[in-house]
Amino acid sequence: MTVQDYMLTLGKQARAASRQMASADTGKKNAALLAIADAINSARDTIAAENARDMEAGRANGLDAALLDRLELTPERIDGMIEGLNQVAALPDPCGEITDLKYRPSGIQLGKKRTPLGVVGIIYESRPNVTVDAASLCLKSGNAAILRGGSEAIHSNKAVAVCIAAGLKAAGLPETAVQVVETTDRAAVGELITMTKYVDVVVPRGGKSLIERISADARVSVIKHLDGICHVYVDKTANLDKAFNIVINSKTHRYGVCNAMETMLVDEAIAADFLPRAAKEFAARGVELRGCEKTVALLTASDIPVVAALEEDWDTEYLAPILSIKLVANMDEAIEHINNHGSHHTDALVSENYTLARKFLTEVDSSSVMINASTRFADGFEYGLGAEIGISTDKIHARGPVGLEGLTSQKWIVFGDGHIRN
């Protein structure tokens, strides 16, 4: 069978399964999630053995330490997969919710009903636990899913797929509601993102090159974010103790995540009081500082290591212990910098001025805008969404962390009693 024929088969099966999933009741969906959790728990040894095969192949193929870390399924990570399934089962089911019900002057009753998207294709790299995260969210939201993991995790993903199929079968749902692509041929991705008849939306999770390629080539809708160039602006009215804790947490809590601060903006009026203190702490934690001309002058005078920032630094997602710092004259300059150089992901203001906070919320064009809080809160779990399928920086129905509701849409529903239009 050719890759094209194989993917076509998956697409047809997913479309058929999606129709059954759309009408599946909450009890059945939750039963499937709990049965998958039980199956994974029972298959721990098999999953670990298959993951060990992937790890061995990864080392032989020269995968770097970061990729190997994401690939590994430790006992704790398997526990996390099981816990994630239990958490999603406990979340409210968004499907079927009817809102905005009202009568029109014509006498008809009009409302909106939340419905699944249909078939969701998810393309991701390295992390086999994403297979479970993606499957659980798609199932609970009434969708069918086609999951294409990285070739480096093929054995792990196949082992997890067996558990997912067993859980679906035990709950009386179609086993084809979640299908893992079992070929490592890259042509499978090209087929998946162009099957407009069978796939409704694609969610890429991975490096920038993967997401750019899918965005350029896809013929189905894409939910994505390319970069997490997140800013924290410390305004002149800020409580400096609050600001210190927020910027340190935003940058150093975890470096390799999309909601970590990459650029810190500081009002010139408080720079002398605030910047050396914060910079000294960053330096003590091993963070390389790259500053504008004024930043370099101020920190050099305080004997704090700093290098001159290049223009491209303002447009870089480091995912590393590196921080760009720029002094600005006022909030207008800060907002202009964020909107010109940011990635519409997450940006924060530290300020005690209510009027300025309102201005920041209104004018910063990002999927999450925060006042006096760390950018690290931009996360599906922290937002009460449970697991997330990803974070969208596009201006579509799903913006910011995409949980269950982001995998649904709304259709108009109309009730009449023989009404006709005059």
Swiss-Prot record:
SUPFAM superfamilies named among the record's database cross-references: ALDH-like
GO cellular component: cytoplasm
Keyword Oxidoreductase: yes
CDD domains: ALDH_F18-19_ProA-GPR
Sections of the chain in a coiled coil: none
Localization (cell): Cytoplasm
Protein keywords: Amino-acid biosynthesis, Cytoplasm, NADP, Oxidoreductase, Proline biosynthesis
InterPro entries, per the entry: Ald_DH/histidinol_DH, Ald_DH_C, Ald_DH_N, Aldehyde_DH_dom, Glu-5-SA_DH, GPR_dom
A Gene Ontology BP annotation from the UniProt entry: L-proline biosynthetic process
Protein's pathway: Amino-acid biosynthesis; L-proline biosynthesis; L-glutamate 5-semialdehyde from L-glutamate: step 2/2
GO molecular function, one term: glutamate-5-semialdehyde dehydrogenase activity
Catalyzed reaction equations: L-glutamate 5-semialdehyde + phosphate + NADP(+) = L-glutamyl 5-phosphate + NADPH + H(+)
Oxidoreductase is among the record's keywords: yes
EC code: 1.2.1.41
Family label: Belongs to the gamma-glutamyl phosphate reductase family.
Function: Catalyzes the NADPH-dependent reduction of L-glutamate 5-phosphate into L-glutamate 5-semialdehyde and phosphate. The product spontaneously undergoes cyclization to form 1-pyrroline-5-carboxylate.
PANTHER family, per the entry: DELTA-1-PYRROLINE-5-CARBOXYLATE SYNTHASE, GLUTAMATE SEMIALDEHYDE DEHYDROGENASE
Protein name as catalogued: Gamma-glutamyl phosphate reductase
